[in-house]
C-alpha cells in the first residue's frame, strides 16, 4: 500500500514538475527588456509576440505596423520572437546607423538556415553570414551592372511579347484575367531563361515542368509558414522541429536543371549573356570561385527572390492602375511618347526615359512592399543610444511596411499617388522612410533587374490593353494573412481589353 502511494505521489509530482519546467524554460528570457528599461510588448509562452501571425490570423506586415503605431513616439520597442528577445526600431536616425553608418556591426541578417535541412536555401546569398556572404556578394555584384542588365534585356522583352499573346486570349473571349497567374507566368519565364538557361514557356504551356516545380516551392501550408517565420525570427525553432523549407526531392531537381544547362553550354559553347553565363564565369574564376551547391544556390536564390516579389509588384500595380484610370492614361501616354523616340521598340534605354512609369512602380512598392521588414543581427555589444547597450546576438527588425504607411512621411498613406515620387516631391521623403529594396551593403542585389522586368511587363500590357475592374474585383483589396509575402486574398481579377490599333 505504501509503495503504491509512493508511485502515485511520484507520478503526480512528475506531471506537475514537467509543465512548470517547460513554462520556466519558455519564459526564461521574458525579463530581458524589463531589465534594460526598454518598453516591450508583453509576450506569451512559446509564441512570444507572434501568436496571431503563427496562427495565420494576421499578415506579419500588419502586425508589426500595429506595434509600430502603438509605440509611434518611441525610438524602439522590445518584442519577442518565440522566446527570443528582439528590437523593433522606429527611429529613422537609428535605422540609418544600423543599416549604413555602423553596418559592420549589423552585416549579418537574422535569417539562418540549417544546411542539413535545406542546402540550397542555406547557401543562397540572402541566408549567408560573415566572410562567406562578403565573398559571394563581391563575386555577384558585377553580374548586375548596367552593361549586364542591358545584355539580358532581350530575354525579358521576349517574355513580355509572349505575355501580350497570353492576355490576348482572355481579351478576345472577354473573360476576366487572373492577374497573379498571368504575371507569375511572365516572371517565371524570365527567371527560367535568365537564371537557369531554359525556356520554361509557361505562358504557352500551363503544364510546363518548370512551372509545376516552382509552384511546389511556393506551395502554402501551415508547416511552411512556420518554417519561414522561424527562419527570420528564431532559427532554433526550425532546427529543433526539423522544419524543411522545401523537399529534398525539389532541391535535387533544381540541381539537375542547373547542371544540365551548364554542361550543355560547356559542350556547345553557347553564350546568351544571361545570369547563368556570368555564374559560369565565376565557376572558373581563381579569385571568385563558386562551385557545387554554392553555385546552384545563387541561381536558386535569384529564382526565390525575383519570381514572387516581381509578380506581386506587377499584380498590385495593375490593380491600382485599373481603379485609377487617370493614372493609367498618363502612364500609357508617356509610354507611347517615349517609344516614338525609340523607333517604337521597348529597350533598356527607352525604359530609363519613362519617368512617370518609374513613379508608378515606386508608389506600388511603397504601398505594397514585397518584404514587410528588414532584419539584422547585432555582432558585438553596441551602444544603440545613451540608455541602451544592445547585447551581441540580438535581432533587430525595421518595419518597412509600417514606415511606408506612416502619414508623417507619406500623407494619406492609403491613397495610391505616384506624384509622391515626382522630381519635386520625392525630395520631401526622408531618407530611410522608403526602403522597398533595403539600404546599405545588404540591400537587394537584384533590385535593378527586378525593377526592369516589372517595367517591361507594364509597358507591354499598357501599350496593348486597357485594364479595368470587373465584378470579381475586390475594392479595396484584402490582404491574405497566411503568406509571408504580401498577397491579395482570393487573387486579383481584372477586365483587360485589347486596343484596336
Curated annotation (Swiss-Prot):
Cofactor section: heme
Membrane topology, from the record: Peripheral membrane protein
A Gene Ontology term for the protein's cellular component: endoplasmic reticulum membrane
Domain of life according to the entry: Eukaryota
InterPro entries: Cyt_P450, Cyt_P450_CS, Cyt_P450_E_grp-II, Cyt_P450_sf, Insect_CytP450_Detox
KW Metal-binding (keyword) present: yes
Record's keyword terms, sorted: Endoplasmic reticulum, Heme, Iron, Membrane, Metal-binding, Microsome, Monooxygenase, Oxidoreductase
Transmembrane segments: none
Keyword Disulfide bond set for record: no
Annotated CDD domains: CYP6-like
Any one GO molecular function term: monooxygenase activity
Residues annotated to bind heme: 444
EC assignment: 1.14.-.-
Pfam short name (any one): p450
Localization in the cell: Endoplasmic reticulum membrane; Microsome membrane
Family in the record: Belongs to the cytochrome P450 family.
Official protein name in the record: Cytochrome P450 6j1
Organism, as annotated: Blattella germanica
Lineage of source species: Eukaryota, Metazoa, Ecdysozoa, Arthropoda, Hexapoda
Amino acid at each position: 500500500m505504501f509503495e503504491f502511494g509512493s508511485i502515485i505521489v511520484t507520478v503526480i509530482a512528475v506531471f506537475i514538475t514537467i509543465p512548470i519546467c517547460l513554462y520556466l524554460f519558455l519564459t526564461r528570457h521574458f525579463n530581458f527588456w524589463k531589465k534594460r528599461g526598454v518598453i516591450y510588448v508583453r509576450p506569451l509562452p512559446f509564441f512570444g509576440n507572434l501568436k496571431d501571425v503563427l496562427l495565420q490570423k494576421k499578415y506579419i506586415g500588419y502586425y508589426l505596423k500595429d506595434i509600430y503605431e502603438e509605440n509611434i513616439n518611441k525610438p524602439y520597442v522590445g518584442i519577442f520572437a518565440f522566446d527570443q528577445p528582439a528590437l523593433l526600431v522606429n527611429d529613422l536616425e537609428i535605422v540609418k546607423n544600423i543599416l549604413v553608418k555602423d553596418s559592420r556591426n549589423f552585416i549579418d541578417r537574422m535569417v539562418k538556415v540549417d544546411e542539413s535541412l535545406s542546402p540550397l536555401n542555406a547557401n543562397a546569398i540572402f541566408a549567408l553570414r560573415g566572410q562567406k556572404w562578403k565573398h559571394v556578394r563581391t563575386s555577384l555584384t558585377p553580374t548586375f551592372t548596367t552593361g549586364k542588365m542591358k545584355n539580358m534585356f532581350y530575354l525579358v522583352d521576349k517574355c513580355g511579347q509572349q505575355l501580350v499573346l497570353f492576355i490576348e486570349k482572355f481579351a478576345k473571349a472577354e473573360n476576366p484575367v487572373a492577374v497573379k497567374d498571368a504575371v507569375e507566368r511572365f516572371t517565371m519565364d524570365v527567371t527560367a531563361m535568365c537564371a537557369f538557361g531554359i525556356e520554361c514557356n509557361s505562358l504557352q504551356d500551363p503544364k510546363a515542368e518548370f512551372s509545376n516545380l516552382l509552384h511546389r516551392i511556393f506551395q502554402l501550408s501551415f508547416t511552411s509558414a512556420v518554417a519561414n517565420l522561424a527562419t527570420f525570427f528564431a532559427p532554433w525553432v526550425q532546427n529543433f522541429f526539423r522544419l524543411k523549407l522545401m523537399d529534398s526531392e525539389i532541391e535535387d531537381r533544381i540541381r539537375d536543371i542547373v547542371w544540365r544547362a551548364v554542361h550543355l553550354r560547356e559542350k556547345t559553347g553557347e553564350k546568351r549573356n544571361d545570369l547563368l553565363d556570368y555564374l559560369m564565369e565565376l565557376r572558373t574564376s581563381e579569385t571568385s570561385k563558386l562551385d557545387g551547391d554554392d553555385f546552384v544556390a545563387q541561381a536558386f536564390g535569384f529564382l526565390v527572390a525575383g519570381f514572387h516579389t516581381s509578380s506581386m509588384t506587377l499584380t498590385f500595380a495593375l490593380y491600382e492602375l485599373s481603379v485609377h484610370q487617370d493614372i493609367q492614361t498618363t502612364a500609357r501616354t508617356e509610354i507611347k511618347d517615349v517609344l516614338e523616340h525609340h523607333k517604337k521598340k521597348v529597350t533598356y534605354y527607352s525604359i530609363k526615359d519613362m519617368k512617370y512609369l518609374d513613379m508608378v512602380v515606386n508608389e506600388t512598392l511603397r504601398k505594397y512592399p514585397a518584404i514587410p521588414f528588414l532584419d539584422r543581427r547585432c555582432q558585438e555589444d553596441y551602444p544603440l543610444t545613451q540608455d541602451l547597450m544592445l547585447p551581441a546576438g540580438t535581432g533587430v527588425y525595421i518595419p518597412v511596411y509600417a514606415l511606408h504607411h506612416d502619414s508623417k512621411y507619406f500623407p494619406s498613406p492609403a491613397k495610391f499617388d505616384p506624384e509622391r515620387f515626382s522630381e519635386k516631391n520625392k525630395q520631401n521623403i526622408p531618407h530611410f522612410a522608403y526602403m522597398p529594396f533595403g539600404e546599405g551593403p545588404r540591400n537587394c542585389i537584384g533590385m535593378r533587374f527586378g525593377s526592369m522586368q516589372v517595367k517591361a511587363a507594364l509597358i507591354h500590357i499598357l501599350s496593348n490593353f486597357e485594364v479595368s475592374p470587373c465584378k470579381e474585383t475586390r475594392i479595396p483589396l484584402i490582404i491574405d494573412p497566411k503568406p509571408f509575402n504580401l498577397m491579395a486574398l482570393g487573387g486579383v481579377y481584372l477586365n483587360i481589353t485589347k486596343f484596336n490599333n
